[in-house]
Amino acid sequence: MLFRSYQKSVLKIGQPRLIDIRTRKTKYIFFIGPTGVGKTTTIAKIASTLRLTKQTKVALITSDTYRIAAVDQLKTYANILGIPLQVVYSPQDMKPAMEELSEYDLVFVDTAGRSHNNKEQKEDIQNLLDTVEDANKEVFLVLSATTKYKDLVKIAQTYSEITKYNLIFTKLDETETVGSLYNIHMLTGAPLSYATWGQNVPDDIGKIDAQSMAKKLLGGNS
């Protein structure tokens, strides 16, 4: 019976939806989500991994000009990796930034943390996403595994009204449970992708493994 439950859980979780690096045109990878979940650090982890291990030509764009030192943080990562960074202050700035980075395979777009309760801020995210055609972009909603489940539900549902997305969960090192990850995945139908468990760049990140999660859900060791 336990094995059957394990099999069902694995099938429901499915395979992680990772960034597709097989692209002929520049692809834009947007990272959206509330404040304080680790979007910028997650971008640095993924960008550095692809840059160093896959030799992917990557670049960065940030629209997070609201948070103190946010641009400087991403600029530091860009300098270390030797990759370009464009700063945009409005959706209108995206076109010239995209023209500057048209020779790159992947462009990671860091967005400002937004309140899911603020209509104007939701529209800001929508307008930014609309600057890139669906065929040329992927969107990742970054959530913290430590956030209360009730709040996760509200956040995920609100962003579902804006766009389709894949799920990234951060701060797994700060919690013992993974039930909220599974439940949000089932609630939204959004594919799971990456998980992070620390601040080290480019380490402490990996794909969400269905077998490991199923074992944890059933009370076993991962």
Regions found by a protein language model. Give the residues of each.
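Primarily NTPase-proximal linker/entry elements flanking Walker-type ATP/GTP-binding cores
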Residues: 1-58, 62-65, 76-77, 81-83, ...
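C-terminal-of-GTPase-core extension/linker across diverse P-loop GTPases
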Residues: 3-33, 37, 90, 100-105, ...
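Conserved catalytic network of the ASCE P-loop NTPase/AAA+ motor domain
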Residues: 23, 51-54, 78-81, 99-104, ...
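Inter-motif core of Ras-like GTPase G domains
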Residues: 56-59, 99-108, 121-146
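Conserved beta-strand/loop subsegment of P-loop NTPase cores
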Residues: 57-59, 109, 134-143, 160-182, ...
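Short acidic loop-to-helix transition motifs that present clustered carboxylates
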Residues: 66-68, 90-94, 148
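Conserved ATPase-coupling elements of RecA-like P-loop NTPase cores
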Residues: 71, 116-122, 151-153, 178-180
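Conserved nucleotide-sensing/catalytic segment adjacent to the nucleotide-binding pocket
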Residues: 78-113
